[in-house]
Amino acid sequence: MATLSNFEIPFYSKNGWLAPLDTYISGDPGFDQADILKPMATSLTGSDGKVYGEPFYGESSFLMYRKDVFAAKHLTMPANPTWAQVATLAKEASGAQPGMRGICLRGQPGWGEVLAPLTTVVNTFGGTWFDKNWTARLNAAPFTAATSFYVNLVKSYGEPGASQAGFTECLNNFEQGKVAMWYDATSAAGSLDGAGSPVAGKVGYAPAPVDLTKSSGWLYTWAWAIEKASKHQSAAWKFISWASGKGYIQTAGQNLGWARVPPGTRTSTYSNPSYLKQASAFAQPTLTAIDSANPTNPGIQPRPTPGIQFVDIPEFTDFGTSVSQLISNAIAGQISVSNALSQSQSLAQSAGNKYKS
């Protein structure tokens, strides 16, 4: 058995490394595959239409903000904010409390750090890493506009030390009252509104900001898969059926607390009265964010692979990390955005050339 994400499963399955789960699913009606959130199920399905993974954790992204700070400054969060509106709000919220900055955005190097939120901005600004013919588009106008916007926003109204701030640093900044807004993973809500959080009850949740698209949240899930070479596939499925099943959600809620159950996996979780009682502030915004995510068509132009905040090829972990370092350097003011993207274009095209027909 293996624990994989929706990044690896599409190409692992294509390479023949994973066993399809469809036979096990059909023979286990109690598992209730139809209850798995559709975007998660889609992202764990191979190009052959077969299921290769079952989620045990899932997330999208949304905008978190301090309701009390907004009220004190007479600011209003739109129901579906645009990035232009968020930039204005970040400016107006900066300094709302001593030392408070308007927004926290990841700047830490890593294909799963700064590139996750940045790529959602690129998508909604009309950009893409590659066109459908594997021509890199990092120095094209939409990608440049999105990156310039992101870098300028975090430099102008973002957290101190932004070039080294990842999820954990932004979580700490938001909890400690150092920022008024934070765009990041829906999973953060469980900490922000959890018992003992200094901002519990003070946080509002809005959809991922947009520009040219209707939605822009990312999609990520950790999942169980079965290796094709396994000699114990039936036993592996029994574990998966338990660990990703409805019963596990119930057991976790009763023993650990409902706010700590695995998020983003099953539709039934979001209609469970016990869960909603503890997660009422963020349950519906989380479900809406996940349901709105479109991993096969996240932008406004065709692209060669699925994936919202990543390019779904093995090489992305390498060239993506190199690109992220250049973006982080731009946030730190060490190089210009145009210089960063010029170098990034070459890195991406070198990887894309392998896939050109």
State where each predicted segment sits:
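Hinge/lid segment of periplasmic solute-binding proteins
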Residues: N6-S60, Q85, V114-P117, A200-A206, ...
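Short, solvent-exposed loop/beta-turn-alpha elements that line the ligand-binding surface or hinge
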Residues: D22-I36, A79, I103, G107-G110, ...
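Short helices/loops that flank or line small-molecule/ion binding pockets
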Residues: N15, V69-F70, A87-G95, T168-W182, ...
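Conserved C-terminal helix/tail region of periplasmic/extracytoplasmic solute-binding proteins
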Residues: A71, N294-S357
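C-terminal lobe and pocket-closing loops
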Residues: S187-V199, L212-T321
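Glycine-centered hinge/linker elements that transmit conformational signals in sensory
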Residues: L89-E92, K132-Q164, G204-A208
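Short helix-initiation/N-cap motifs at beta->coil->alpha
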Residues: F7, P81-A87, G161-E175
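Paired acidic/hydrophobic, glycine-rich loop segments that form the ligand-binding mouth/hinge
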Residues: M1-T3, A180-A185
